[in-house]
Design a protein with these regions (language model features):
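Amphipathic alpha-helical polymerization modules
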Residues: 1-144, 204-302
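Cysteine-poor, low-complexity segments in flexible/peripheral regions
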Residues: 147-208
């Protein structure tokens, strides 16, 4: 059975066109890789690598959220620590004044002048007790929207702890129990006298010159100072821990970006060589096909 010359000619043209189209497609793909600098442009390029890249991107997004929580926690801790440091300095000054006056060598005008300085210290401690960070009261526990220390010095907060998420299934507390600072352990009959009340007792004992009451207040003040020191130390340890977490998150994100660059990024030297080979292959294919194609069709394909 004879082969139809027209069919044979059509098959020859079709095969040539397919061959040129395939070579040109490869060259275009390599050229796009060289221009974009990325070797993963669609999932079919490397399904396993693409899935890994997507997982890394999700992890990076999560790390960004954890870092925001971490930054908030660090700021909250720093503001609380600054307030405690100022409270500690105020209590040290109050202790110095009470020691001076307890020697009974000062006259009444001097004692009243010292009492007025104590009044300023009391007001300052109340202000510090109502310190806020990002519109949240740092000493109130869960009660972050209302002042935890009343004008008369009573603690109005609760014993709740505020946690921030710093990683998957990992949470850290960023506040202290304000009651441990503003309701002082010990005191008469095991009660917890409010910190401000201790200072108020010192103030009134100087005005009325009640040495016994002044000495009792000094004992309570020592307990208050120890409570503030303990709270400050615990905050310092938490702050250092969060700094360590921050560094770990930075390292983790850097590794994820590096991994994605290795998976997605094209080797530019290799891409340049591949592009040159593809161009040569295309030129060779066009030259080899020119004998089988009419000049007009060949020009159209170029």
């Amino acid at each position: 059975m004879a082969i139809n010359p027209r069919i044979s000619e059509q098959y020859r043209y079709g095969s040539t066109l397919d061959r040129i189209s395939n070579v040109k497609s490869i060259a275009d793909d390599i050229n796009e890789t060289a221009i974009s600098g990325r070797k993963l442009k669609k999932i079919s390029d490397d399904p396993v690598a693409t899935i890994r890249v997507l997982r890394n991107r999700t992890r990076i997004t999560n790390l960004d959220q954890y870092r925001k929580s971490l930054d908030f926690g660090r700021g909250f801790l720093a503001k609380t620590e600054d307030a405690l440091t100022s409270i500690s300095e105020s209590l040290i000054r109050a202790k110095e004044l009470s020691i001076q006056q307890s020697n009974n060598i000062y006259d009444e005008p001097s004692r009243k002048a010292v009492a007025e300085e104590l009044r300023q210290i009391i007001n300052h401690v109340i202000i510090l007790g109502n310190t806020t960070y990002s519109d949240k009261y740092v000493f109130g526990g869960f009660q972050t929207t209302q002042p935890p220390v009343s004008p008369d010095g009573h603690y109005l907060g609760d014993d709740g702890f505020i946690f921030v998420q710093i990683d998957e299934d990992s949470f850290r507390p960023i506040n202290i129990n304000g009651r441990t600072v503003f309701d002082v352990p010990g005191g008469e009959e095991g009660k917890r006298p409010p910190l401000v009340n201790i200072l108020e007792n010192m103030y009134s004992s100087l005005f009325t010159w009640d040495r016994d009451k002044l000495h009792e207040s000094m004992v309570d003040l020592d307990s208050a100072m120890n409570s503030v020191i303990t709270a400050t130390a615990s905050l310092g340890a938490r702050r250092v821990a969060l700094e360590d977490v921050s560094e770990r998150l930075d390292r983790g994100e850097s590794q994820l970006h590096s991994d994605n660059n290795n998976l997605e990024g094209a080797d530019m030297v290799k891409s340049a060589l591949d592009l040159k080979r593809a161009e040569n292959a295309l030129n060779f294919t066009l030259q080899a096909s020119s004998k089988m194609l009419t000049p007009s069709l060949l020009e159209f394909l170029k």
